Structures are given as structure tokens and as C-alpha cells.
Amino acid sequence: MTWIESISRAKAAGRLKTLYEKYQRLNGTIANIYSAHSLRPHTLEGHTALYRAVLGHTGNVLALWYLEAVGLYVSILNQCTYCIDHHNHAGGLAYAGKPEAWSAIADALMGDRLEAVFGGKELALLGYVRALTLDPAALTAESIETLRE
């Protein structure tokens, strides 16, 4: 994923090795984004804290699967293959037990056919996400007020 210098798990030592062990996946691998932080391990901790606060906070009112759907949509709009793979996988995990339902959501997002699976507030928020990602300067206070209704 990254073109910057990074330290592999096999070559990690000290604090970085400890963090890699702490944040490893069940299969013993680490996410590529962690490798991108390897030269400055404190940023890896900050990244993880922010990610968990945004997606895993108990105060969230939006379901985790929907937050991952938003992440997937932004990734699609930005044409970031790595991020698409990450959020598609994470969304599937968040929608555990219903792989066909997540597959339909992911397919609709990838085909920009949002109305096929979303409606109401979910669809409105995805419209805002699209505008914020592709043309943030075009957003106005009215854009936000519409979402609050």
C-alpha cells in the first residue's frame, strides 16, 4: 500500500514490536496502515485511538455496519483500492451472520445505486458524504440543515 519506508513485523523491535503484537489480527498479521506508521509508533497509537473512537464508541447512534458502509462509499469515491478492501471486509464483519445482506449493500455502493438498499436518513447522509468527498466547497449551511430534518 505505502511508498514510504516502513518496518515489517519481522524486523520490528522495542515499542513498535509491542504495538504490532497488541494490534495484530487473529491470524497474526497486521494491517498495512500500521506498517505505514512504523517509523513513528506513537502515531500508530493515535491512529488506533481515533479509529476506535469514531467507529467503536458506545455513544455512536449509527450502526457499525452503516459507518463501515460510509467508509466504503468514501473509499469508492476516492478510488482507493486498499481502503475499499478494508471497509468491505470490515463491513462484512459488522454485518455478521448476514453475508448476502452486506454483499447487496457493497454492490449497491460500488455501482452507485444507493437507492437499491438505502432510503430516508441513510440515503440522505450518503448524499452528503458524496458531496463532502467530491466537492466540499459546494456545501452550505443548508446542506447540514437538510440532514437535521
Predicted segments, located by residue:
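Hydrophobic alpha-helical segments
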Residues: 1-149
